Amino acid sequence: MKRVTKHLVRLGISLFVLFVLIISAWVFFYFRSYQQKEFKLGVNFSKSYSEYLELNWQKTFVAILDDLKVKNVRLAAPWNEIEPVKDHWVFTDLDWQVNEAVKRNVDIVLILGRRTPHWPECHDPAWIIGLPQEIVVERQLKMVQKVVDHYKNVKNIKIWQVENEPMLDAFGICPPSDINLLRQEVSLVKNLDDRPILITDSGELSFWIAAANTGDLFGTTMYRVTHNPWLGYLYYHLPPAFYNFKA
């Protein structure tokens, strides 16, 4: 009986010490300063989302460049916009965005691939619906090559972003994530141009391991509040340590 009592006492002390250590570590990292002294501010621009908001997308983009005077902008090449019909390539609107940024000496991150920002994430052209998966992949790689070939002489494009959060399966209407296909895309872009490749992943819903080890640069998100049609508003009370730990 005495042995059992001693064992329980030791276990209780050990659990208490462990609890104190965990709480202390949490408090330390929660209140620790993570201020970044050197960083660049930029914006993301989406033609389709501007239209969704019933804005004149060209006037909106010019206002962002001239009124906000941003020097870094992220643009996208949604598949359904640049190849609306098989082998019919339309770069007119994206060319306009790129040229307006170049006029003002704005640095560009260009997103390419099947998955680009904003719902439904995978902006598939209608003509790929029903095609065998291997054909879709073949066409996807061809689309990536076309985009890089079209823009690789634009010096203001500093970074290629290949896909947008490609390992995130919890959001968007997309096929399951495929790290091997992502690596194929990255390898293809590297063979076409030597600028760095950015891979992104969700700040709250992913572990970053696969994405962070695929490109030259890694980017993530930080959401404090999101809205879900079934659950309503969701609040992420996550300290900086949450992101620092994953990094």
Predicted regions and their residues:
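Aromatic-lined substrate-binding rim segments of carbohydrate-active enzymes
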Residues: 58-123, 174-198, 234-238
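Hydrophobic faces of well-ordered beta-strands that scaffold small-molecule active sites
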Residues: 41-45, 73-75, 108-112, 158-162, ...
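Boundary/entry segment of secreted carbohydrate-active catalytic domains
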Residues: 24-71, 76
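Active-site groove signature of glycoside hydrolases
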Residues: 115-119, 140-175
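N-terminal Sec-pathway targeting helices
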Residues: 1-20
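Glycoside hydrolase catalytic-domain groove-lining segments
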Residues: 179, 191-247
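Short, acidic/polar
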Residues: 51-67, 140-148, 201-211
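The substrate-binding groove and active-site-proximal loops of carbohydrate-active enzymes
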Residues: 46-52, 79-91, 126-138, 164-176, ...
